[in-house]
Amino acid sequence: MLTCQRKRESLSKGIAGKNATRSLAILGLFAAPWVGFLAVALKPSPRQMWSQRWPTITFVGLYQLALDRCVEIFGLEHLPRTGPVILAGNHINKTACDAMLMGSKILVERGSLAKFVSQPNPPDRMLKHFLRLMGNADGVILPIQKGLTTETMIKFLRNPEAFGRQQPILGIFPAGSADGDFEAQMNRPWHTGVAVAACESGAPVVPFYIEGLPYHWGPFDLLKAASRSLVGSRAFDFKIHLGPPIVPGPGQTNYAEVTERIRHGVLQLAG
């Protein structure tokens, strides 16, 4: 009983501390809006964030002020603190807002800026513009290039310094496109690129299962959700579940088998 009470008290103090920090940050914005916002955005990892383009800086700042309270992560202990890591799991949002939220949460919790593999030609004109801005070497997006994507993934995992990183964390959606139907996404063929990158680089694959974000939401929906979160309760409840790392054996070349192990890991997390 006493242990449970202490845990509850510790959790309450942690939440109170986060809320106090958030309130101070908001007050700072009133005093010096642009300087205050930039300070908030750069805080998780000043060196990495300073090299980012304005859409990334803006989103990370907004995330810390209003959206972090809408995102929960479970199993963070499974994410290695050093060395290359691949995150692989389900994809639930057609404009990759799930990747943006997941990357921001890991940045806030660990100080590492993840890079997510992305489709090269999104249908929306604004998203295409963002992709061009954030798809550079230091950016948070690794655009798919026919015949070159897996090679670039391996380079990122082996030589993070060339991409402005200390620890390379690569996010991949092996099913490809997003789908609101989890079962359908699990049953369709998965790309083996994640397995190839893991086997070639020696990086462990941490499976993830995400839930709680509408399929159709775009950046403007997140902006509206942020405004609601600033003045009231959480606008949505996005949950990230991380599983134990999957490590390919030495000399492993059966990429289909490794891919199935990853798929099974995601299914286990989904329950």
Briefly describe each language-model feature range.
Residues 64-256:
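Soluble catalytic domains of membrane acyltransferases
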Residues 58-59, 127, 194, 262:
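Generic structural signal for hydrophobic residues
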Residues 6-8, 223, 271:
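Intrinsic low-complexity, intrinsically disordered segments enriched in polar/basic residues
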Residues 13-16, 27, 35, 82, ...:
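Feature targets compositionally biased, intrinsically disordered low-complexity regions
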Residues 260-271:
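Short, cationic low-complexity segments
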Residues 17-20, 39, 78, 150, ...:
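Polar low-complexity intrinsically disordered regions enriched in Ser/Thr and small residues
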Residues 3-64:
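N-terminal membrane-anchoring alpha-helices
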